[in-house]
From Swiss-Prot:
GO terms for biological process: protein quality control for misfolded or incompletely synthesized proteins; rescue of stalled ribosome. The gene is pth. This is Peptidyl-tRNA hydrolase. One of its GO terms (molecular function) is tRNA binding. The record marks D86 as: Stabilizes the basic form of H active site to accept a proton. GO terms for cellular component: cytoplasm. The lineage of its organism: Bacteria, Pseudomonadati, Campylobacterota, Epsilonproteobacteria, Campylobacterales. Its EC number is 3.1.1.29. Keywords: Cytoplasm, Hydrolase, RNA-binding, tRNA-binding. The active site is at H19 (proton acceptor).
Amino acid sequence: MVLVVGLGNPGKTYESTRHNIGFRVIDALLERRSALNATKSTFKGELHKEGENLFLKPTTYMNLSGESALPVSTFYKPEKILVIHDDLDLPFGAIRLKRGGGNGGHNGLKSLDKLLGNDYYRLRIGIGKPPLGWEVADYVLARFSQEEEQELEERLFPHAKEAIESFLEGKMEWDRLVSRYSLKPSTPKEKV
């Protein structure tokens, strides 16, 4: 069994923000897998079960994500946990798979690390650094530009879904999975 946790903040206010990319990937994945209806909401989150796999969107705020993931993990005892989250240290358009490591100041990861330890798998989705003069909190709670939304829909979400599907199948060695599904940012289109 694999527990896939998408990080984000609950509510319409945060729906399309940079910090909610984990929720959005879970939604895109479940839509494709026909499992969009939540089966349980007793773990401070929306929990979807499909076959042997669990998909969790904590309904706590980002900095309390571990309070949702811990009881799910304790009850179901998954063999692996994959966390999907935004990453300021990667440029927009980049995707990296990683196991363990530091939290990079990400409050959702801090909460998970505190309650679960940090030996879980991660799908890091780059959102880039805030522009000069922006506070980090304002940047991660801002919406993507129209061009970025288009790239999310056409390039990043399909790639992330494919990476997660391969991870869930468990047929590919970790190093090969990391190599195959790491994604560099797209190059800017030349202006004519």
